Amino acid sequence: MASGASRYRLSCSLPGHELDVRGLVCCLYPPGAFVSVSRDRTTRLWAPDSPNRGFTEMHCMSGHSNFVSCVCIIPSSDIYPHGLIATGGNDHNICIFSLDSPMPLYILKGHKDTVCSLSSGKFGTLLSGSWDTTAKVWLNDKCMMTLQGHTAAVWAVKILPEQGLMLTGSADKTIKLWKAGRCERTFLGHEDCVRGLAILSETEFLSCANDASIRRWQITGECLEVYFGHTNYIYSISVFPNSKDFVTTAEDRSLRIWKHGECAQTIRLPAQSIWCCCVLENGDIVVGASDGIIRVFTESEERTASAEEIKAFERELSQATIDSKTGDLGDINAEQLPGREHLSEPGTREGQTRLIRDGERVEAYQWSVSDGRWIKIGDVVGSSGANQQTSGKVLYEGKEFDYVFSIDVNEGGPSYKLPYNVSDDPWLVAYNFLQKNDLNPMFLDQVAKFIIDNTKGQTLGLGNTSFSDPFTGGGRYVPGTSGPSNTVQTADPFTGAGRYMPGSAGMDTTMTGVDPFTGNSAYRSAASKTVNIYFPKKEALTFDQANPTQILGKLKELNGTAPEEKKLTEDDLVLLEKILSLICNNSSEKPTAQQLQILWKAINWPEDIVFPALDILRLSIKHPNVNENFCNEKGDQFSSHLINLLNPKGKPANQLLALRTFCNCFVSQAGQKLMMSQRESLMSHAIELKSGSNKNIHIALATLTLNYSVCFHKDHNIEGKAQCLSVISTILEVVQDLEATFRLLVALGTLISDDSNAIQLAKSLGVDSQIKKYVSVSEPAKVSECCRLVLHLL
C-alpha cells in the first residue's frame, strides 16, 4: 500500500450482542443498514444514525432455541417490499423475519444439524447449507430439493440466479457447482475446509478456507489465482461494490483488505476470532468478532471515529494477548528479540509485524504506512499468488478449442467469436452461441450447419416433414427424401459468401400437416416464423387404450386366487363387465351404485393380484359419475389407497396403473379438485419412481406433471408451478424415452407461458441447460420443435 493512499480506519464500535457475532449482511431497508446474528440467539437490525456517524440498534429479533450462525436477506416482493431476513441456527432451523417483526413469520424445518450458511435468489428462493452435509433449496416455506454429494458439513453456499447455478463449499475441502439439483462440477484445490464463498461476476467467484488461502475461480472449473496473506483459518469473505476488490476475516485476529489482487491493508482487532464481515454500499466494512463487538471501518474522513475513540481502540488492541500458536509470528526465541529501540526503524510494508522484547514480555507491533508508525497489537503469550494459464491450438476465454470462428452478424458491425471443439455437439454449440450473444434462436439450424461444413462434419439434410399427433404417434414423422437446398459452403452463416438471408425464398423450409393435438388445420412454418402447436396445453391428457376382453379374462383368472373375503361372485363379475362395457362403448347409461361398490371392492384386492381391477378403474374414472363417487365422496380414502401403491418397492404394474388413474382423474371437476388438494403428497411420492428404467412409468409421470401444469396455467399458483418445475427438472435427469421427454417439454412450456415469474424460476433451476440437448433430436421431430419453442421463452 503506497504512502498517501486511502486507508481504512475505525468508524465506530457497536456493543450489543452478549456473545460472538457470527453473521453479518447488508440490509435493503433502511438504506445503509445491516443485520447481525450471534451466539446469544438474537438477530439485530442496525440503522445508520446519520450520513456520517454511527449506528443504532433498531430491532432485536428472537426465535432460535440455540445460537444463530448465519443470516441473509431475501429480496423484496409485493407483499414484503423491504424484503425478509433469514437466519440459520444450531437448532437446525431457519427463521424468517420481516424487518419489524420480533418473532419469525415462519420457520423452515428439514435440516438435521446446524444451519451454517444461507444465500437468497429470486422470487423467494433460498439456499441453505448445514452440518448435516446437505444443502436445501427452499421456495417460500417449502423445501423444493435437497442437494446431496458432500461428505462433510456444507459451510458456505451462494446462488448465481441469472445462470440458475448454485455453489456449495464444504469441510470435505471441495466446492460443488449445482444446476437443477444435480452436481455439474467439483472444484478441487483447497487443502482444508472451505469456509466462505463470494460472487465476483456471472463467471467468477472467490473462496476462502482453513488452509489460509483465497482462491479465484471460473465457474467452468479453472482456478485463476491463489492469494496468501492470512496465517490461520479464513472464516469469511465479502466483495466491494466494484465487484473486484474484497475483504477477508480470519482466526489470526485480522481483517485484510485486498485491492488489485494484493493485500492492501491489514487491520488487527482485539479479539481472537474475526468471524464475519460485510461491505456496505458506501464501501465501509462491518466486522463481527468473538468478543461480541461489531466494528465498522471506513476510508471516509467524515465517517472516521474521533481521535479519542481511535486511541481507545488502539489501547484495547495493545492490551490484547496473542497466542503464538495462532498468530503469524513464527518461532519465537525471546532472548534473541531486539528491544524497543528497534521500533525506531520504519517498516517496509503495510501490516508488517515486528516483535520486540520489553523485559520479560514479548510485544507485537504492526506497521502503518499512512501513520508512519508502529502500532502495538498485543502481548505475545503462548504469500504470494499463483497464476494458472493454459495453452493450446486456439485459446479463447482461458480454454483450448480446435476452432474459433469470427462471425459478422451485420456487415460493418462487430464480430462475435464462436469457439468449437470437434467433440462438441454442433447444435449445442450453436444454441449457446446464439443465447450468449442474444441472437435470434431461429438461426440455430444455419449456425449448426455452418459449424458442420467448416469443420468437415457430416451434412444433415432437411426436407419436407408431415406432422402427426405427438402423443399417439399416429401418422408418425418420416424424413423427406427431397427438399429445398440449404447448402452453406465455408461461409459465415450471417454475412459471408452464400450466406443465409432471412426471408429469402430459396432458403424457406416448408412443413405441412395437421395440428398434433386435435388433428385439425394445417400450418406453415418458416425460419422467420414458428407456429406453436404444442403449448400451453389447455386440456388434460388421458390414457384411453384398452382391451376389455383381456382385462376381464385376467380379472376372472386372478379372482380364483383372491382371499375368500375378497372374492367376487359371478354376479359381481357381471356388474364389472357391464361398467367396463358402458365405459369403452361411450354409452349414455350411468354406472349404478352397486357397480361402483363392486369396483371399490375389487381395487382393494391384495397388491399381487389387483392390477386388472386397477385397469378397470383407470378407464372408469373418466366417467363423470365414477369420477364424482371416487374423487369426491371417497376422496381422501381413494387417493391414499392409490398413493400407497406408488411405493418404490411395490409392483411396477400397480405403480403404472395408479399413475395412469391419477392422470385420468383430471377429466372432471371433482377429480381436478382432489388432485390439487393432494398435489404435494402425490407428487412427492410419484417422483420416487423416477429412478427406474420402466419407460411407461416415465411417460405416466410426465403426463401427471403435464396435467398439473394444465391446471396451474389456469390458476397461477407459483408454489404449485415451482413443485412442477422441480419435478420436471428431476425427471429430466434420468428419463431416456423421448415420448416422456416430449410430454415434460409440453408441461414446461405450459407452466412458463405468459408467466415471467415461472420463467425466472425455471431459469433458476437451470432447466434451460437441461433441455438444450433435445434441439438436435431428429425423430420424432416434435421433440426438437417443442424444445426450441420452450428455449425461445427462456
Swiss-Prot record:
UniProt xrefs under PROSITE patterns: PFU, PUL, WD_REPEATS_2, WD_REPEATS_REGION
Listed Pfam families: PFU, PUL, WD40
InterPro entries linked to this entry: ARM-like (IPR011989), PFU (IPR015155), PFU_sf (IPR038122), PUL_dom (IPR013535), WD40/YVTN_repeat-like_dom_sf (IPR015943), WD40_repeat_dom_sf (IPR036322), WD40_rpt (IPR001680)
Tissue expression profile of the protein: Expressed in the brain, with highest levels in hippocampal neurons, cerebellar granular cell layer and Purkinje cells.
Disruption phenotype: Mice die perinatally and exhibit spleen, lung and brain developmental anomalies. Display less matured and differentiated embryonic cortical neurons. Display reduced ubiquitin-dependent membrane protein trafficking from early to late endosomes. Show reduced prostaglandin E2 biosynthesis in embryonic brain, lung and heart, but not in liver at 18 dpc.
Positions annotated as WD repeat: 17-56, 63-107, 110-148, 149-188, 190-227, 229-268, 270-307
GO cellular component assignments: cytoplasm; extracellular exosome; nucleus; synapse
Main location, first listed in the record: nucleus
Keyword list, A-Z: Acetylation, Cytoplasm, Developmental protein, Neurogenesis, Nucleus, Phosphoprotein, Repeat, Synapse, WD repeat
UniProt domain PUL: residue ranges: 533-793
ARM repeat start and end residues: 546-588, 589-620, 621-668, 669-714, 715-754, 755-794
Induction of synthesis: In smooth muscle and endothelial cells by leukotriene D4, by tumor necrosis factor in endothelial cells and by uric acid crystals in macrophages.
Chain positions found as Phosphoserine: S50
Record carries keyword Cytoplasm: yes
Record-level Gene Ontology MF annotations: phospholipase A2 activator activity
Record's subcellular location: Nucleus; Cytoplasm; Synapse
GO biological process, one term: positive regulation of dendrite extension
N6-acetyllysine modified-residue sites: K529
Sequence ranges assigned to domain PFU in this UniProt record: 366-465
Record's function text: Plays a role in protein ubiquitination, sorting and degradation through its association with VCP. Involved in ubiquitin-mediated membrane proteins trafficking to late endosomes in an ESCRT-dependent manner, and hence plays a role in synaptic vesicle recycling. May play a role in macroautophagy, regulating for instance the clearance of damaged lysosomes. Plays a role in cerebellar Purkinje cell development.
Family: Belongs to the WD repeat PLAP family.
SUBUNIT field: Interacts with ubiquitin. Interacts with UBXN6, VCP and YOD1; may form a complex involved in macroautophagy.
Domains (record comment): The PUL domain is composed of 6 armadillo-like repeats and mediates the interaction with VCP C-terminus. The PFU domain mediates interaction with ubiquitin.
Stated name of the protein: Phospholipase A-2-activating protein
